[in-house]
Structure formats: structure tokens, C-alpha cells
Design a protein with these regions (language model features):
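Acidic, Ser/Thr/Pro-rich regulatory low-complexity segments at or just upstream of the first helical elements
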Residues: 1-88, 92, 96-108, 151, ...
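Alpha-helical bundle/repeat cores within regulatory domains of eukaryotic proteins
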Residues: 113-119, 123-124, 128-150, 154, ...
Length: 184
């Protein structure tokens, strides 16, 4: 997988949004999940090779000593199974994490990725979906954490993305295009 998140407003000039929209409609949720999990697994392996483990814990609200036994892909499938979040919400949650990484000096590792995924899905779900009827405690149960923790993680993600929840259409379709290219 060759993908670096390098979106900027000039990047999208080559994107044919109508074609991408049609492709997005045909894109399966499992393809998105596979892409996201592959991306994070590659990033974690790269960070593990390049960084000192002690740096991973510095100022990391998402760090957990206990790593879930599920793979990232199975963890995402679990979230989908119990929330039925839409494909667009899943992509938006991924973009939120990419924005955090993009700001620099944030090291993704096995000890923080699961909490990042869970809390970004919660925020994207609240922002993007009309059927927002799940309580934070429900999301916490899905991820195996208590209400206080999920509330703290929600606040932490919002702070790290400066409460910028809106993802412009060009950025969204830029990422969709990357997923589609990877599937071919």
C-alpha cells in the first residue's frame, strides 16, 4: 500500500467527483475496513521500527497498557456490527485520526490505535448520522471501556482536531479515491 495522507486544496483538481461518487456507492464497507486496518497496521509497524517505545506514551491520552486481542480489522467490524454506522461515517472517523497524525509528533502504536478508532467513530457518528441514538456508555461497552474513559477520549479527540468536525467534500473524495485505487 502506497498512501501518505497529503491532502490539500490543490490536490483535488484531478478528482472527478461524479465518478468517485458512483464508485463510493459501489464501495463495500468491508473494503473500507480492510483499507483502514492495512493503513494502520503498516503505520504501526513503521513507527515501531523507527521510534523509541517510551516516546509513544508521552502525552498520549489514548494509551492503554492492555491491547485488545482483536485485530484492527476485527475491532472495526465489531464497531460496525453494534452501531451499523454508515460508510461515510467510517471514512470521516478515519480522516479525524489522519488529521491528528498530520499535525505531527503523534505516534500511532498498538497501545493507542483502538481507543483512537473507537472515539473517532463515536464523534463521526454523532456528527454525520441522523440516527444518533446511542449513548456514550454504549460505545464504551463496544470498546471495553467505561463511561468516564469514553467521555474523556471524546473530549481529547475533539481537542486534538480543534473541534473541526466538518470534512469538506473534496477531502472526503480524495480519501475515497485512495481507497478505490488500493482495491484495484
Amino acid at each position: 500500500m502506497e498512501f501518505e495522507y497529503s491532502y490539500n486544496s490543490t490536490t483535488t483538481e484531478s478528482i472527478n467527483e461524479n465518478l468517485i461518487y458512483e464508485d463510493f456507492q459501489n464501495l463495500k464497507t468491508q473494503e473500507i475496513i480492510s483499507y483502514i486496518s492495512l493503513y494502520f497496521n503498516n503505520l504501526i509497524n513503521q513507527n515501531y521500527k523507527n521510534k523509541n517505545k517510551k516516546k509513544e506514551r508521552q502525552n498520549d491520552d489514548f494509551y492503554s497498557r492492555k491491547i485488545p486481542l482483536l485485530t484492527i480489522e476485527k475491532y472495526l467490524n465489531r464497531i460496525i456490527k453494534y452501531t451499523q454506522i454508515e460508510k461515510s461515517t467510517l471514512i470521516i472517523s478515519f480522516i479525524y485520526i489522519l488529521h491528528i497524525i498530520e499535525k505531527g509528533k503523534y505516534i500511532i502504536c498498538k497501545n493507542n490505535i483502538y481507543r483512537l478508532i473507537l472515539s473517532s467513530c463515536l464523534i463521526a457518528f454523532k456528527f454525520n448520522e441522523e440516527k444518533n441514538y446511542f449513548k456514550n456508555s454504549y460505545f464504551g461497552k463496544i470498546g471495553g471501556i467505561n463511561l468516564n474513559e469514553i467521555n474523556f477520549l471524546e473530549y481529547s479527540i475533539l481537542s486534538k482536531i480543534n473541534y473541526q468536525l466538518y470534512i469538506n467534500e473534496n477531502e472526503f473524495y480524495f480519501l475515497v479515491e485512495q481507497i478505490i485505487k488500493n482495491e484495484k
